[in-house]
Amino acid sequence: MSEGSSAINASAPAIVVRDLDFAYSHKQLTVLDKVNLQINHLDSICLVGPNGGGKTTLLKLILGLLTPQRGELRVLGHPPADVRLRLGYVPQYAYYDPLCPVTVLDVVLMGRLGMQPLGWYRAADRRAARKALAQMKMEHLAARRFADISGGQRQRVLIARALASDAEILLLDEPTANIDIQSEQSLFALLKELNRTRTIVVVTHDIGFASSFFQRVACVNRQVATHPVAELNGQMIQELYGGEVSMIRHDHNCAGQHCRPGENRGV
């Protein structure tokens, strides 16, 4: 971790959820019911499940953007709101005005907001932003307008923004949505590298992507059940989604080349 980060207590879990209930008051509908989940440091885990099952809600609870009605939630040993600056969030969509001349470097510098006492970016902030861009191999685009780069490049820039905050936990919402297969393969390699030093939590509908990268999968549909990815099968997915599902395992080792029969199997 770079300057300004707190030491990680590797003996304590990164995220602990115990008997958590959450309901949106305006809907009067329980979204999450008696949820229990533990995510350890340097885990890579994905949250999968049907629309409305509570995946994004659980992510927002971990980020401290929502408060549960019941139960306990600790992130890095603290209430989520107390450690927001130690969490890096990559949204599914980046809303921006295409007429706004904000540059790639400007976007990454936003990851340093809240770290300066007077609100001005320091030299250390600019160094951290450029280092994050270099990690993403995006430093050559620093001066380009964010609106002018491709979807896959924007995804990398948003991850760089999260890295610029020196985040200990990265939370990504549907990172493979709206990007092509080459960008997905690049993202796969990138997440594997980042997982060497950071805990990775991803919301995804792409079960194949989950099967190729993550150590564990958390099936979310009001309640949460976790499984090692190796144990995930079509029957589990069918029960989770409530219908017939075909599960295709991705093989990123076959990217850009023809795979022999059996190397990329459906389950």
For the regions a language model picked out, list residue spans one by one.
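Catalytic Walker B motif of ABC-type/P-loop ATPase nucleotide-binding domains
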Residues: 170-174
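ABC ATPase nucleotide-binding domains
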Residues: 233-267
